Amino acid sequence: MSRHEGVSCDACLKGNFRGRRYKCLICYDYDLCASCYESGATTTRHTTDHPMQCILTRVDFDLYYGGEAFSVEQPQSFTCPYCGKMGYTETSLQEHVTSEHAETSTEVICPICAALPGGDPNHVTDDFAAHLTLEHRAPRDLDESSGVRHVRRMFHPGRGLGGPRARRSNMHFTSSSTGGLSSSQSSYSPSNREAMDPIAELLSQLSGVRRSAGGQLNSSGPSASQLQQLQMQLQLERQHAQAARQQLETARNATRRTNTSSVTTTITQSTATTNTANTESSQQTIQNSQFLLTRLNDPKMSETERQSMESERADRSLFVQELLLSTLVREESSSSDEDERGEMADFGAMGCVDIMPLDVALENLNLKESNKGNEPPPPPL
């Protein structure tokens, strides 16, 4: 391919540009075309002192290195992201970083990941030496075949190795980076006709797919374990919450029981106090009544007072007796008066003179005088 497909210059904003591509190893996702890099384009975050990794298209690589005979293990040229020195291979870059920048902890972008197919073009790491030893060791996986290993080492984004086989349509394939970041698509072809054949390419593709699937499984493994840990934590929290609720309920029940017992005890105490008060009051009243009786029974009056009281009582008794006798005598006298009047009437009938008592005669005289006063005067003569 003659273009950096999917990549745009961050200075002139030209997309899918031709020529050399310069990727900053300090700034995240920052690419420049050749003209902007040579003119010294800078921004607020990017300066000309930042190390840049040069990436070529396949056409430019064939143009620059087409006449040279490269072995299978011929490395690419990488730039140190710390000091900016160029021309390192994978092994020499690892040796340089471990010897010169072992204690440096600045966050940089791995130039090898940006150049390898399927790698992260913006992989940021703060321990570049450990990243190189873990991810970009010189002896590749031993379980892979030599052809597959050669394909992995010779594949490079934006580059292709020379030879007439590189231009055959059935011997190259395209790859693109993921994540929406700056990427490049290019065709790949082997350098030796004997070493590489279509079966080896298919095997290399299958191994790449297996590696990507294994990486995804490895990346998803801790997430599943984290989910399990979270579930266990949630279950423990729920158990703790239930235990706390049970403790609260037991405490509430205990407080309610104590309150009811205290209420009953207070009621019994109040009833006992009222009963005791009532008994005390009744005892006091009994004692008071006893005291009154004793006071009445006690002889406190003098002899003269007693004699006067006895005389008064005797007089009263005599008066009552006289009243009773007088009433009885009046009834007998009234009956005797009626008998005498009957006898006087009998005497009158016999022609005897009626003898009036004096009070009756006086009453008759008074009646006659009053009648005379009430009579009208006689008519004049």
Swiss-Prot record:
Residues forming coiled coils: 224-257
Post-translational modification N-acetylserine, affected residues: 2
Gene Ontology biological-process annotations: negative regulation of HRI-mediated signaling; protein K63-linked ubiquitination; synaptic signaling
Binding site for Zn(2+) 2: 24, 27, 46, 50
InterPro entries: Di19_Zn-bd, KCMF1/Dystrophin, Znf_C2H2_type, Znf_ZZ, Znf_ZZ_sf
Alphabetical UniProt keywords: Acetylation, Coiled coil, Cytoplasm, Endosome, Lysosome, Metal-binding, Phosphoprotein, Transferase, Ubl conjugation pathway, Zinc, Zinc-finger
PROSITE patterns: ZF_ZZ_1 (PS01357), ZF_ZZ_2 (PS50135), ZINC_FINGER_C2H2_2 (PS50157)
Start and end residues, zinc fingers (C2H2-type): 78-101
GO MF annotation terms: transferase activity; zinc ion binding
Modified residues annotated as Phosphoserine in this record: 2, 169, 189, 212, 335-336
Subcellular location, principal: cytoplasm
Record's GO cellular component terms: late endosome; lysosome; plasma membrane; synapse
Region (Disordered): 154-193, 250-314, 329-348
EC code: 2.3.2.27
Function of the protein: E3 ubiquitin-protein ligase which accepts ubiquitin from an E2 ubiquitin-conjugating enzyme and then transfers it to targeted substrates, promoting their degradation by the proteasome. Together with UBR4, component of the N-end rule pathway: ubiquitinates proteins bearing specific N-terminal residues that are destabilizing according to the N-end rule, leading to their degradation. Does not ubiquitinate proteins that are acetylated at the N-terminus.
Assembly mode: Component of the SIFI complex, composed of KCMF1, UBR4 and calmodulin (CALM1, CALM2 or CALM3).
Protein name (record): E3 ubiquitin-protein ligase KCMF1
Annotated organism of origin: Bos taurus (Bovine)
Gene: KCMF1
